[in-house]
Amino acid sequence: MQDGTLLAAVDLGSNSFRLEIGRYEHGHIQRVEYLKETVRQGGGLDEERNLSQAAMQRGWDCLARFAERLADFAPRQVRAVATQTLREAKNRDVFLERGNAILGHAIEVVSGPEEARLIYQGVSHLLPQSDERRLVVDIGGRSTELILGRQYQAHEVASFRVGSVTWSKQFFADGQLTAAAFRQAETAAQAMLDEALAVYRPERWERAYGSSGTVGAVAEILAACGHESGVIYRQGLDWLLQQLLRAGHTSRVELSGLKDDRRPVIGGGLSVLRALFDLLQIDRLHVAQGALRQGALYDLIDRSSPGTDKRSATVAGLAQRFAVDGAQAERVARAAGTLFAQATPQAGDDAARELGWAAQLHEIGQRSAHSGYHRHGAYLLQNSDIAG
């Protein structure tokens, strides 16, 4: 990738949509522009898990504004990712069809583990080089991601369906902030996160980091109110809980550092964060600067070179996992590559690389059935938790 190349990441979160534009310089990304809009799409899911028309319209309106900034960007310069709300939404295809057209770039609904991997990429690239074993926590609107990693490599990734929007809607729907509601919310969060303890127990990491969303919001409040900046301690969470209980209602919370868009979801977010502190025995949580969107930007850099493209390793792993006939795949790749070069000589290396992956995986569905194997293969690929 050439120095000076502009890259963009669009993060369609459950609470906010974000656009980050950066310039590639000597292996690093310098921020050029950052936009954030509170869309609260996660709050627009009904009991049948369908997005309301109003929630979709808020999202489309935001994407239209982002599209103005991305008009001159080529597809290889942009990665747009959607997370838990669109993973859940039964009518997501309705939103995506129009959203893709408005944005001018394909929106990818990433799996929970892929979201966690990208979060770790974003966090690790903005931390000093270190060999420490890291725990990374990201509490979003409808999901919480946990990652164990070292340097730039994530070793364990997991995503749980508990977040600030869902917990606020479930336990603080009327805005009332009571001790009983917090007890119920924390107990429910621990029940959802309990299985994480086997993998993310304290002896497996040396330092804990929190990124984006709730962690950033809580850290800003604590710092603005005189607590140590850049780190969250349990006593800080206890102090914040008392302030919320004293206020009694979200509309009456008066705290420096609390932004208006965080006010309706601060109860749910704090209860999940407190549950994690208890469950994983966290005594201090360092606030990371990177998050999902930075991870998507650095992933674009990796994708620009065949040697670092995570998707190549993923394809090789899938071919081995499903016992694809390697010799046959290679013959298909050569034949398809020859025809492709003759038919579209102007096509670039990216398209040829994707065709090669398709050749490696085109018979993957035969592990399920010979009849209609291409449809089985498509289903397996679409529903596998795979990196990249």
Briefly describe each language-model feature range:
Residues Q77-A80:
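Conserved beta-strand/loop subsegment of P-loop NTPase cores
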Residues Q2-L7, Y24, R40, G44-F73, ...:
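Helical "lid/coupling" subdomains associated with nucleotide-phosphate turnover
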Residues S16-R18, S143, V215:
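Structural motif
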Residues L12-S14, I139-G141, R150:
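A generic beta-sheet turn/junction motif
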Residues Q2-Q30:
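N-terminal basic/disordered segments at the start of proteins
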